[in-house]
Every structure is written in C-alpha cells, then in structure tokens.
Regions:
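N-terminal export signals
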Residues: 5-27
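Intrinsically disordered, low-complexity N-terminal segments that are enriched in acidic
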Residues: 30-126
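Short intrinsically disordered coil segments
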Residues: 79-82, 130-140, 293-296
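Acidic low-complexity segments
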Residues: 93, 115-195, 201-214
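Secretory-pathway-linked proteins and extracytosolic
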Residues: 104-159, 340-380
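Active-site neighborhood of thiol-dependent amide/isopeptide-bond enzymes
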Residues: 174, 178-182, 187-277, 299-302
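Active-site rim recognition segments
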Residues: 248-252, 256-380
Length: 380
C-alpha cells in the first residue's frame, strides 16, 4: 500500500520524539548563530531508497534517514515521503536531537521502497567575512550555557586527554585568547593533515588513533574531528556538523571546479556520494562560529597545489569563520544511540542513512549496495 505524508515548515514528531534530550535541553541556551541579510538559495533534495538486503537475509527491515537541522543559516521548509513501508515517522528523540525519518517494513522479501523530497533554504554563514567579531572581546569570566557544555566533553572518537591534550598544548602554547587558540588549531589541522581519497566514506574520525599513529591523513570527518578534539582539549567548545553537498559553489569554484561541489547548467547535481562533515566552535560572548579545514585539504589535493599557494591560502582564510552554503547540515550527533534503538548500538555519527535487516546492518557507505540515490536541484 502506498503511503504519503507531507510536512511544511515543521516536522511531525512521534509521541516519544516530543521528549527532549536530557543532556542538551536545559534552561540556559546559547544564542543561535546570526546570519546577515543575504540572498538565500533554495534546493530540493530528492532521495530514492530501494533497499537491497544481503542475499539470504530475512526479517524486519528498519531504516533511519538523517534530516536537516534548522538553524539561522539553513531551514528545512518542506518534507514529503511516500513508499510501501508499514510505518514511517519523524523523531528527534536522541541525545543530540538529531532529526530522523524512521521507516519499517515487516519483512525483507520483495521491494522495499521509500522516496523522500526535502525542500531546503540556505544562506551563506560568513561572520568573519562580515566583520561580525570586530568588537568582540573574550569575557573576563567565561561561563558557557548549559547546552554548550556537552561540546567540551570527550566521546569515544574524540577524546580530550593523552595524545590529544599533549598535541593541543604544543599547538596553542601560552595563547589565552580563545579565538586565537581556535585559529592556531585550525591552521595546524589544515596545514598538517592531508586528504586521502582511498579512505572509505568520510572517514571514522578516530582522533586518538590518527594522532598516535602520526599518519595525519583522512577525509572530512577525520579533519573535523581532530579540530573538534583539539579545541575541546584547549577549553573551547566544538562540534562536528554532518551533512551533504547540494550543488555548485558560486564563490569558491574560482579556486577549484570540483572540490567544493558542482552541478549541471540546470542546477541539478547527483549528490549520492556528496556527504561532507564540517566543524563549529563556540566563543563565549559571541556564539558559534564555522570552519572547514577538511575542504582546504581537499582543494589542495584536487588542484595539486602546496599549502603555501596563493589560492590555497585564500581558501584557507575564508574557511575559518565562513561557510558557503551549497551544503546542508543534518546533525551534530557523535557516538550516540539513534531512536528507535539499533541492534548495533551507538553510532559513530549519523551523516549517512542507516538500515538493518533482522538486526544486521546494510553497507551505508555504498549507495549502490544499500541502495539509494540522491539528486539535488537548485530552484532558480
């Protein structure tokens, strides 16, 4: 039986999903990031899932799909989904409030279909470019809001002691200004780490392993997580935002036609493999700020340039404190349990769809094996 549900300017929450996460839903909250009035971009992200359970598998099929978080720089304005599932609903009932479309099928035999259309509006988030910090000074006494404090804590993949703390101290030295400390960490990550296209997906972001091994290579989750862990170890709240590219980079494409996202002349892009992780850090007395050291390394490799190259340095400067929003973020979840709970336990992150057949996961890193396809179309 075909089922269709449509949500506009809001999302439908399950009864369980109305319960906020205990760690983050406190009475004192950080101010939302501010975005100067700029032209907004509009995209439709169309997702097609035809789940492909492994041969011989049987049993209940469950699918968790990450949906965009609403912020000052991006909003999910509409959501529609249809398919032959038995149940499907949206929930945020997890520690990070990660917005999730959950669907189930009673058995893995036969077609397992769901189509999802997401309307998204974005605005470039450029606080440093817009000189938003020109009057900022670090408070004499730094007190973080309760919903920011969790982003100082370690997780399984982002520890803040041992080699991480040792490295952070070497990078920041005697610097006390939190913005300058964040910049030192960002510069270290973008200049010392290298992109490795052989890494599966976006990388695992296992910071302790990366630093202990001395092999400072990986992909976007690896770079972003190293930045996050080093920042937290330095007393600066930081977090990853897992998401996906949506199309052409209007501003940064002058430096690379391929590194930052692309689309055809009609604004259509196949983004099935376009997952990308970015990072944010928090300044007391101001709020959250964006950065993206991983895309510096991606551009450097794509264009076969050194870090000292003028174009690389221009990108490096822009991506500390600014994001071009031909991309959308899903959630900040790291080392956490989805809802409903998976058989496999805590997720490293939730930047990809996740599915289980009778408790066994399907390879979400391979769109063809899973299988899913994503097409983003910019509305002009």
């Amino acid at each position: 039986m075909q089922r269709r549900q449509f949500l506009k300017n809001s999302v439908l929450l399950s009864a369980a999903g109305l319960v906020g996460p205990a760690v983050i839903s406190q009475t004192v909250h950080a101010a939302e990031p501010s975005v100067a009035p700029v032209a907004r971009r509009r995209f439709v992200l169309s997702q097609t899932y035809k789940l492909n359970p492994p041969k011989g598998s049987s049993g209940v099929v469950k699918l968790w799909i990450p949906l965009p978080v609403d912020t000052a720089f991006q909003q999910m304005t509409a959501l529609a989904f249809s398919g032959n599932y038995k149940h499907a609903y949206v929930t945020t009932n997890n520690t990070y409030g990660a917005k999730t479309l959950f669907a189930t099928w009673p058995d893995s035999q036969g077609e397992l279909l769901i189509n999802v259309d997401i309307d998204i509006e974005t605005a470039d988030w450029e606080p440093l470019k817009q000189d938003a910090l020109k009057t900022w000074q670090a408070p004499e006494q730094i007190i973080y809001p309760l919903d920011v404090k969790p982003y100082l804590l370690p997780t399984t993949h982002t520890p803040v002691d041992g080699k991480v703390l040792e490295t952070a101290r070497k990078i920041t030295g005697n610097e006390q200004d939190p913005l300058k400390k964040a910049r030192l960490i960002y510069e270290w990550v973008s200049s010392h780490m290298e992109r490795d296209n052989d890494v599966i997906g976006c990388g695992t972001g296992d910071v302790a392993e990366i630093l202990k091994s001395g092999k400072l290579k990986g992909k976007c989750t690896d770079m972003s997580s190293v930045f996050v862990a080093l920042a937290r170890a330095s007393g600066i709240p930081a977090r990853e935002l897992f998401g996906i590219r949506l199309g052409k980079a209007n501003k940064l494409e002058r430096y690379s036609k391929s590194a930052f996202g692309k689309a055809d002349s009609a604004g259509v892009a196949d983004v099935s493999g376009g997952q990308h992780c970015r990072a944010e850090f928090y300044l007391a007395g101001y709020g959250w700020l964006p950065c993206d050291p991983a895309d510096v390394t991606k551009m450097r490799l794509a264009e076969k340039k050194s870090h000292q190259d003028a174009d690389v340095q221009a990108v490096n400067t822009y991506l500390f404190g600014n994001w071009e929003m031909n991309w959308v973020g899903f959630n900040y979840g790291r080392d956490f349990e989805l809802y409903p709970a998976t058989e496999q336990g805590a997720m490293n992150n939730f930047g990809y769809p996740y599915a289980e057949v009778d408790g066994d996961p399907i390879n979400f890193y391979d769109p063809k094996a899973f299988s899913y396809s994503y097409v983003a179309t910019e509305q002009r």
